[in-house]
A protein has these predicted regions:
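Positively charged, small/polar-rich N-terminal and surface patches that mediate targeting and assembly
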Residues: 1-96
């Protein structure tokens, strides 16, 4: 098992949630209103000087589903190069 961890701009929330559900993922955890800075886009700190916020989506999936999810993120990054999409995967040792 892996933990798929996706950081994305809040203004893409409806689309991301819809795509995830259409792909068959009914169970996930969403953290809304996160802030951060990266090296490819402007910071999203929720302030007048760095407006905007991110959301985080976490999905526990079998290893073989990770390539499909990563390809979805690659497509979003191609379609929206300044969007600020970032995906991470982690080994998931246990889920209770």
């Amino acid at each position: 098992m892996k933990m798929f961890f996706l950081v994305y701009p809040d203004y893409f929330d409806t689309r991301i949630t819809s795509e995830v559900k259409q792909a068959g993922y009914k169970k996930y955890t969403k953290v809304r209103g996160t802030t951060g800075a990266g090296d490819e886009t402007s910071p999203k700190l929720g302030t007048p000087h760095a407006p905007g916020k991110n959301n985080i989506l976490l999905i526990a999936v079998p290893d073989e589903e990770i390539p499909h999810l990563l390809e979805f993120v690659r497509k979003m990054r191609r379609d929206h190069p300044t969007g600020g999409f970032r995906a991470f995967t982690f080994p998931l040792e246990e889920c209770i």
